[in-house]
Amino acid sequence: MVKFLKQNKAVILLQGRYAGKKAVIIKSFDDGNRDRPYGHCLVAGLKKYPSKVIRKDSAKKTAKKSRVKCFIKLVNYQHLMPTRYTLDVDLKEVATLDALQSKDKKVAALKEAKAKLEERFKTGKNRWFFTKLRF
């Protein structure tokens, strides 16, 4: 079977708290491990999408509308829908498995991931990833 759920692939979560949210695969575990004996992956995604920015907005308002909130999570392959898009954001060093072990490490990883995703949004690349999924 061809492994197509690779790193940097954009996916949509189908189950759980973040169902319908877009995420990007950071690391995939095709054969599972001792804790999770099924195929799963580490994803980072957008909890809250940036709002629409218009020309007449002030710089302060534009900065506020450009904010994103993100999440880092381990997800079963069954709960993902892959898309044709890829997102070349380097989150491999930011979000690791040991970052999920303790609260303070996770908070630090979330801040770094948020900064990288906001910077990617401000450059105007990967526009599809930063738009809310309408359904």
UniProtKB/Swiss-Prot annotation:
PROSITE patterns: RIBOSOMAL_L27E (PS01107). GO terms for biological process: translation. Keywords: Ribonucleoprotein, Ribosomal protein. The keyword Ribonucleoprotein applies. GO terms for molecular function: mRNA binding; structural constituent of ribosome. InterPro entries: Ribosomal_eL27, Ribosomal_eL27_CS, Ribosomal_eL27_KOW, Ribosomal_eL27_sf, Translation_prot_SH3-like_sf. GO terms for cellular component: cytosol; cytosolic large ribosomal subunit; cytosolic ribosome. CDD domains: KOW_RPL27. Belongs to the eukaryotic ribosomal protein eL27 family. This is Large ribosomal subunit protein eL27x. It comes from Arabidopsis thaliana (Mouse-ear cress). The gene is RPL27C.
